[in-house]
Amino acid sequence: MNGAGGNHQQQQQQQQRLRQQQQQQALLMQQALQQQQQYQSGVLAAAAAAAMTQMEPISNGNLPPGFDPSTCRSVYVGNVHPNVTESLLIEVFQSSGLVERCKLIRKEKSSFGFVDYYDRRSAALAIMTLHGRHICGQAIKVNWAYASTQREDTSGHFHIFVGDLSSEVNDATLYACFSAYPSCSDARVMWDNKTGRSRGYGFVSFRNQQEAETAITEMTGKWLGSRQIRCNWATKNNAEEKQETDNHNAVVLTNGSSSNPGMEASQDTGSKENPENNPDCTTVYVGNLGHEVNRDELHRHFYNLGVGAIEEVRVQQDKGFGFVRYSNHGEAALAIQMANGLVVRGKPIKCSWGNKPTPPGTSSKPLPPPLPSYQPVPMAGVPQGFSAADIVAYQRQLTLSQVAAGQIAGQHGLAGQVSAGLLAAGSQALYDGYPNQSSAQQLMYYN
């Protein structure tokens, strides 16, 4: 009995030790599983935090050099369809985060607005995901909002024109290219508001005149992106165009009212007796032409600039000069800036304003696209000399000119014609603001 009892007791002890070992193993496995889960959750959290930290939208508009959006939680919304309401705008932008405030400023053709988020990440996500989104068939523009004091006033600086910019060059790229000059204060690429594409030129501002002159000499012919750039002093018209673009892209809010000092300055400066200030002057004088340059060749060179509709081209081959008339003053001013110094047949041409303004009532009809310098092999049933793109462009220009002519005819007197010309050149505009309820600080919002 004693032997049997001892064996039974030993078996119980062994079973107890086995259960303890199993419990210890289960406990160790549970602890290991918990540690693994904690590690994985920590890694995921760290990865998520890193991803959110690295999330940064690409700048798509006129932000000031060195702008730091690290504390910004407000975005500007441009090119908003007139049918869009504030409630619809809030609904769209809440896809990126909780919206604190939304304000929509209505315009006849396209409105604009402002969206304030409770945190910066939501604002950054809105710029990344909503810029270019179509609402009511119209692509909106979304960018950071920032204090006006962050952009330096360059009205008294020295401005240079930079042409032949490739399509991928934006403000930040242009500024970085010229930032090697210590007095470089600003850089702007001019954009077409209808197409959203670069116009192929821009302006760079300098505090020091000597550095601006050095930049013109040293940077001309340098590669920026995929093209070699051309630099020159900005003419008065181009400087005003830059100021006008600043005014168009910016709304300065001061105690609930918009201020636009640059607009007033451009209206009051200068006399209309000078060609550069006379909206009726639309003709470009072209000098230093080789005697072999004829009307078609001159037309082709200015047509390739792509600055506007050409209505007349005249050449005095024996005297080495000619004239190119555009549909409006702004197009002619841009052509002077872009074509001056252009090498034609081995000679740099000289461009300036024609002496005589275009008489009121002059027929406004764009010339057909010029023939190419080579002649394609004739094919039956195919129009010769022009590409399909040329024909479409010509038809579009012709339609726009006819519409513009009808609008001008509806005006009364010369004042109406001048006003229509100014509007066609895009040199006048009115802008409104809205009161910033959260801060008395001036705010500036850029496209």
UniProtKB/Swiss-Prot annotation:
PROSITE patterns: RRM (PS50102). One of its GO terms (molecular function) is mRNA binding. Coiled coil: none annotated. Residues 73-147, 158-236, 282-356 form the RRM domain. Residues 254-269 have a biased composition (Polar residues). Keywords: Repeat, RNA-binding. Pfam families: RRM_1. It comes from the Eukaryota. CDD domains: RRM2_PUB1. The keyword Zinc does not apply. RNA-binding protein. This is RNA-binding protein 208. It comes from Oryza sativa subsp. japonica. The gene is RBP-208.
